[in-house]
Amino acid sequence: MTNYREMYADTKIIVSVSGGKDSTAMCLNLIENGFSITEFTRVFCDTGWEDLTTYQYLDYLENHIGPIIRLRANVAIAPANRELVSRLENQLGFESDFIRYVIQWGKFPASPHKWCTDRLKIRPYTRYLRTLEEDYVNLVGIRAEESVKRSKYKEWEYFDTFECYTHRPLLNWTEKQVIDIHNRHNVLPNALYLNGHSRVGCYPCIMARKAEIRKISEDRISIIRELENLYDITYFKGGKIDQMRSWSMTSRGGTQFFLFDTEKPTCEKWGLCEFANGGTE
């Protein structure tokens, strides 16, 4: 069994929390290894472009893993843009640095230059870390089996940007282990997983899968459509949001429309289909 006490001796433990299953499992793993919630700090970097479900889940999660510090980029609003920002944020339901940045610069993030990660996550997180006086370690919930790229990550790695070591304690965990630790602690997963999403984060992510594009809410599509038309840009590489939504409703080849959703419900792997389309109350 890993001796985390020895591993993190004399070091402040900072856990990157996303509202996703892996970062939640990482917090539960610390608790399971004898750490109280006062012995590690949970930090969430808020892009202002999450699904409302994720914000609600973070509130729920605090009852199980302790308070979560929420960081924002606090993008400034030019006077000429205030009315537009206010209207779109009211439609969204919360303040959004993502929307403010799109309006300020007239562009969506795009691979490989994903400013959403750099401007809205890394920079606020770096500013926070540099306010700390003690030595610290950054814990990240990444698993090797998620992708070929992640399978090449090291468990320990030093980052000059953060001026600290990053530890990936779940690197060799399976998804089943992640689900099992939720169950042992009676912690529900983010409801997005139960409703067919494979990931939690920006909603939608510019790298979203076809099935995830199919599940984007009409309210979010409306905001994306307006920004696309206003700045003559596209959210997804393949075309405008309405084109991509139509494509997402087709089978392979893009010519035959689905009559039924044939994907196996993701709630089955959690054994929680009764919570699908619901929340965490």
Segments (PLM) and residue ranges:
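ATP-dependent adenylation/nucleotidyltransferase module used to activate substrates
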Residues: 1-185
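ATP/NTP-dependent adenylation/nucleotidyl-transfer catalytic domains that generate, transfer
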Residues: 5, 9-10, 188-190, 195-281
